[in-house]
Amino acid sequence: MISGGKLTGLRDISSVSIRIPRQSTNCGGEVLKKLCAAKDNVLIISPPGGGKTTFLRECIRAISSSGVRVAVCDERGELAAVFRGVPQFDIGPMSVVMTDIPKSEAALMLLRSMNPQVIAMDEISSPEDCRAAASAVGCGVRVIATAHAAAVSDLKRRNVYRFLLAQDVFNNIVVIENNAGVRSYRLETLQ
């Protein structure tokens, strides 16, 4: 149901999906090692359900464990699963989390107040999210984010991501593919 342009409720529900996130350490293999060693901005892509959030969480943990300050924009609580102020997932010792706040606002607040070296954002999908990522990069902060796409060509077809590509916000793209139930991770460099 929509009231005043906002979703206010649901009715005639035919199904419910309950997503149960889990920690998966060391996923991504060599690609994860390259991302931890590099200082580049990275966009992680795959279709829905492809493992983007799980891989991003592992990137956060690995980078933070190396002594780098990571600010996590966890709008829906999927990255850190914060409960009473404590992350329920291991996101590393140098991570701070802002949860239940729109990513675009959280990124700018974290940028101003937490002195991050890296900002992590899951499922950037709006012009505001893209502008926040570009602002962070413009301030010298590394950004690692996820987006729904099967390939770079998909990003180029969508207006919201064309801005990021035109502004050279991301240097690298990690493409996650699922072949017969086995995930593979490929790192592509943007020119």
Give the predicted meaning of each segment:
Residues 1-40:
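P-loop NTP-binding catalytic core
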Residues 44:
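Hydrophobic anchor at the beta1->P-loop junction of P-loop NTPases
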Residues 114-174, 178:
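Conserved P-loop NTPase nucleotide-binding/switch module
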Residues 55, 59:
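Hydrophobic positions on the alpha1 helix immediately C-terminal to the Walker A/P-loop
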